[in-house]
């Protein structure tokens, strides 16, 4: 943190938060919730979503040749998506995301997939 006392204080607070058992428990619940909802979309659109893989909140969605189209449609819906290869859309939400924000994302993501 470069010796800056403010940076050190912020870093300490973040570490305390992230290492807190309740934070980790909530994060695990949210990541399972996100994954379960993505699997529901995959079940509805197996011709588009080939695979979903990840760990925690780092998720890759295998979508074949649709990756760049999904990214472009995401921008229109104010959803930032990253294409990590020609066939994978990477989801990497911030760790403090709420269930309501996950629901909003899932709604928009399904609309994107449905429009293809």
Language model region names:
Residues 1-116:
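Conserved N-terminal phosphate-binding loop of PLP-dependent enzymes in the Aspartate aminotransferase
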């Amino acid at each position: 943190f470069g010796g800056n006392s403010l940076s050190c204080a912020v870093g300490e607070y973040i570490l305390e938060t992230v290492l807190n058992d309740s934070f980790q428990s909530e994060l695990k619940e949210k990541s399972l919730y996100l994954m379960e909802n993505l699997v529901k979309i995959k079940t509805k659109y197996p011709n588009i979503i080939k695979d979903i893989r990840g760990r925690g909140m780092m998720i890759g969605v295998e979508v074949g040749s649709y990756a760049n189209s999904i990214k472009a449609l995401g921008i229109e819906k104010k959803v930032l998506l990253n294409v990590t290869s020609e066939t994978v859309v990477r989801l990497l939400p911030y760790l403090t995301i709420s269930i309501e924000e996950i629901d909003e994302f899932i709604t928009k993501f399904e609309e994107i997939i449905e429009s293809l």
